[in-house]
């Protein structure tokens, strides 16, 4: 009977995965079906509080409205990112973008690593909230990568920094339960998750190249990939262990980008012709700054607003989050697109035309995104207890393998909630209690949870749908997930092994 309850609690996730991957249906068709099924479960099988039908309606009504509002905020960011891509296409600046990036390196594999991994790490620290994939995927598509590949690379590249998120919030707020209980500190939480993610940073450059080009992609580029992996690994370890959670993501991305570009310029990469980014030679329509201006403004304004506004305005961060954290990111991306249009001397009529064309493409995403968010909220709700049932049953089944299970639970939490922060907040208390019962270190177990939650973002349906919308690939979510799942599996197994090793062998008394 217990197993049946577990399967029923898991069934909304099964519906989504089977619908998208098994039946190859678009998320816009699968998401409403999953929502209806989850509502049926919420009214019947998982009515844990014994609420009447009217009381259940009142609970779900609030969750539905919350899903619609949060979905609209995400679609707004998708709209802003897609406007920039369409603006580059419409003006012809996209060719000048390719020519400019080629001045750094015309090797498409180098471009994939820098834009697909290092840029998302920086953007995660500067803003978070889905901005890395929403910005990096269109950028990669603009460079000529297949849109599905571009999305998959951007999601994979953002697999490690989500544990810190914008200004360290995912670790700071997500691990607050351990800090409040006096069993850990923010510094210890950041240090231990950094010791897990450093190995992810080490191998992700190789995974990105394999994802985009297959085995042949490693031809004559292994030294560069090894250098980028080792330096990113080292920088991430140093910042997370000796500086702080607030700057780990942004600092790792920025320093690693500079080191990577420095290697290309000083050492060089012997690029086979098949991996060169060929573009049509023509007279430039825009200067390098003009063509890249929307992205230059994003790189400058996201961290400037995130760190500058709270420093200059009393309760500035609270003001920024008045309508939710993601809204300020939406506004900045929209502003950067508009400033980019002005820099490229695009007329208001043309800019408005691009906006209208983009709106037609992204509006249907609202139904998909809202449906998935509502499913997530219902599963998290105390009214149903579905998410807690999944996590607690998993924990009971694994016993001494709990550190490894914590990684999987963290990934499952972010797969459902769409955020590492949500996953951490949801399960931190449970992990602390389990660690006490099993006589294990709660810091290393929570680090596994935090690292797993970061990984879950790369296969989360919400993030996949949003990223697909930024490059006009709505309906091809199954193709993206087929690309990201193998890389996710590799990293998940690695992190589970590290969680066991750290908890049981290397750091059983860490923080004591």
Show which residues each predicted segment covers.
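Hydrophobic mid-bilayer segments of alpha-helices in multi-pass membrane transport proteins
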Residues: 8-18, 25-50, 75-81, 225, ...
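Core transmembrane alpha-helical segments of multi-pass membrane transporters/permeases
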Residues: 58-95, 114-121, 287-308, 321-385, ...
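Membrane-interfacial loop-to-helix junctions in multi-pass transporters
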Residues: 69-74, 101-115, 143-149, 326-329, ...
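Short helix-coil transition sites and intra-membrane helix breaks within transmembrane domains
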Residues: 72-74, 85-95, 122-134, 160-168, ...
